[in-house]
Amino acid sequence: MRTDNSGSKHEGISFVLFDMASPGVTTRPIKLISGSSPFCETFFDNVKAYKSNLIGEEGKGWAIAKYLLTHEREMISGFGAAPKKSVGQMALETIGSDATGRLANGVLRQTIAQYQLDTMVFGATMARVGDEAKAGQGLGAASSIFKYYGTELNKRRNELNMAALGEQALGWDGDEYRGGVVSRDWLRSKGNSIEGGTSEVQLNIIAKRVLGLPDA
């Protein structure tokens, strides 16, 4: 919350905890196209916050918020990690293999191969930066790189799952229907590039703090 208006917009912000059940706090779920409601909008109408719940120093809340955002983005980037059942496995089960044992759809096979290579590189990079963080080096803008690329990988994975299932991704009643989960995951993945800071925000951070590009 803002406790001082005399400085810049990033100064004068304090990090204060408050009870979400406090009078004046209203939370409304936002229903996504997947049908779930993991997002919400919160309204504050004359809500009281107490100085005894101040975290850190007064006026230094922005630094705390940035620290938390760094770790939130790192967590969200994990959506791009390889799932238990790979895209290739699902495609083989659905489409089948050719005489050489490879996925019968050659175009989809190449696309999946590129995705899997990108996932391996992403995992290795995350492991390296994780070791650097354990050694005392801060994540810095790397969290924005991970958040952007990890969520884009997750969207690619869900797109490939949908492509592999084809018409089976459409819903019907019956015990053999698997497409419901896949299509819902695909729809839900669109929110990954919004939560924790949109992909556009992450690209701006990368441009300024990593590449040193000037403001537009």
Where is each model-derived feature located?
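Glycine-rich phosphate/cofactor-binding loops in nucleotide/flavin-utilizing enzymes
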Residues: I64-E72, I76-S77, L165-A216
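Tryptophan-centric aromatic hotspots in well-structured domains and transmembrane helices
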Residues: F15, F39, F43, W62-I64, ...
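Short, glycine-/Ser/Thr-/acidic-enriched flexible segments
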Residues: D4-S6, A21-P23, L32, K48-A49, ...
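A short core secondary-structure module
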Residues: M1-R28
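C-terminal helix-coil-helix/basic helical segment that borders enzyme active sites and/or dimer interfaces
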Residues: A99-R109, M120-D175
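Short glycine/proline-enriched turns and hinge-like loops at secondary-structure junctions
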Residues: K9-G12, S37, G56, T198-S199
